[in-house]
Amino acid sequence: GLQAQVICLSEHPDLPQQDLLGVPVSIQLATDEGVLYPINGVITDIQSGQSDGTLTSYRLTVGDAMSLMRGRRNMRTFVGKSVPEILETMLGEWQQRSAAMDRVFDFELLLDRGRYPKRAQTLQLDESDYGFLDRMTRHDGIWCFVKAGTRDGSASNAPVHTLVFCDDPMRLPQSAAGTVPYHYGAAVKERDSITRWSEARSLIPGAIRGTSPDH
C-alpha cells in the first residue's frame, strides 16, 4: 500500500482543512534520467504546523484507497463466491459509494482465476473492509501494490491510482526502472539506487477470541 507524509508550504495560514481531506493528489519525483515519476494517492490527514508570518507549513498524509477502507467495519457472508469475485464485489462497492471515490481509484486483478474455486461461505466477521481483504489475500498468496494512473492507461481529470492484486510476478510487465543497484553509504551516485536495507518487526495479536453476536 501507500502511506507517505508530505510537508507543504503555503502563503495561507487558514487553509480549510476539511475541504482537503479525500482530495486526490499527485507527487512527482524526478528520476536519475530526468523523467518525472508520479505517485498518486488521497489526502487522508492534514495537520498545520509552524508559521513565520509569511509561510505556513502543513503536513499531509497521503494514502491509497485501501487505507480508506480501514474506517468501515462490517459483518457479512459471501455465498458461492471465489476470492477474485469477492475482491470485485467489495472494490466495486467502494467505487460506487460516491462519484468522488470512483474518480480516485481503479483496480486490476492479475490473478489466475482457475486457482480459486467458489467457496460455500466466506465470512467477514466484524472486521474493517481493509482487514478482511488483507486477511483473505494473504491467506491465498495474493499481494497488492499501487500504481499511478488508470487500469487501462486512459486519461483522467484527477490523479487516479490503481490497486493491483497479483499472485504471480511473471504476470507483471517489466519495470521502467530496470535493475536497481544497491549502494551502501551516502555517496552520490550517477543512478538512483537503494541505500538502506533493514529488518523491521511489529507486535500483532496471536489470537482473537470473540463472543457470539447472537444475543
Functional labels for PLM-detected ranges:
Residues G1-H215:
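Amphipathic alpha-helical and helix-coil boundary elements used as assembly
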